[in-house]
Amino acid sequence: MKNLHVISHTHWDREWYRTFQQFRMQLVHLIDNLLVILDNDPDYLHYMLDGQTIVLEDYLRVRMENFAKLQQYIQENRILIGPWYILPDEFLVSPESTVRNLLIGKHICELFGQRMMIGYLPDPFVHIGQMPQILRGFNIDTAALWRGVKPGMPTAFTWQAPDGSQVLLAHLYFGYGNIAHWPVDTLENSLASLEFAAKRLELHSNTSQYLMMQGTDHIEPHPATAESIRFYNEHNPDGNVAVHSTLPAFFAALSQEIEDKNIVLPVHIGELRDPQKAHMLPGVLSSRMWIKQRNWKAQTELERWSEPFSVWTEVLERGEDRACC
């Protein structure tokens, strides 16, 4: 029996083939619809906002009146946010930028009362070797990603940084949208589609916990999700069980199975940048160089000048004659 963890989500690029404001219009429409689904269908259990928190800021600048409702559903674990502020391109920003990204994401998650403690990295163009070390610095011991994994690695393995820090990694073998447009036109076809996706994963899985990623770029939640999961569980011929799940629930089940069955996971040390299974897109290292130069100048001035010198005001405050006596 396989456990199919259906993860309803979207992958959100704030600007890409459309402008930021055009994509924000879509984002507002998406979250408005999500709130309607959550209001009206108690069986629609979870939706993940791509591991980012900046989308909440973008939405609330237009729909501030929905803050309380968003906060409620986040605290109820029906909307999952974080741990990132924004999904990083790991090779194009400084190490400190990556750390601050997680730190700001943590602060925003605390404001809403819930934080997804998974290193979710669905689409960065390959991965730095120190990422497990950075994640463990924020008490995150699991990660899920797609690109850069060499052929032959299973869906679950251990990723290790050069300093020895390790995380349990879920390899999104067929990407972050292996059931992106599920459910389909009929309940029967939806059953067959989910069964096909499970059989594809079976060839590469070393556990019985399968990630079924129901989402892709800028896609909205599907209102028939809960009904389609019920139909699948009642009629599938293989005895598999589908559940409307979350990444934390998936990793809890995965960790328990690894422990119960004494599964020995392969270990990968360092960078994940193999191009054979998924495009590395190395052209991003040199495209629009003026943007990269300005970004590097801004982050360097913040890291090396503005922030270090700003602390001197606090030091000097303590040098007043009565304070130092």
Where are these regions (language model features)?
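Catalytic-domain carbohydrate-binding cleft regions of carbohydrate-active enzymes
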Residues: 1-325
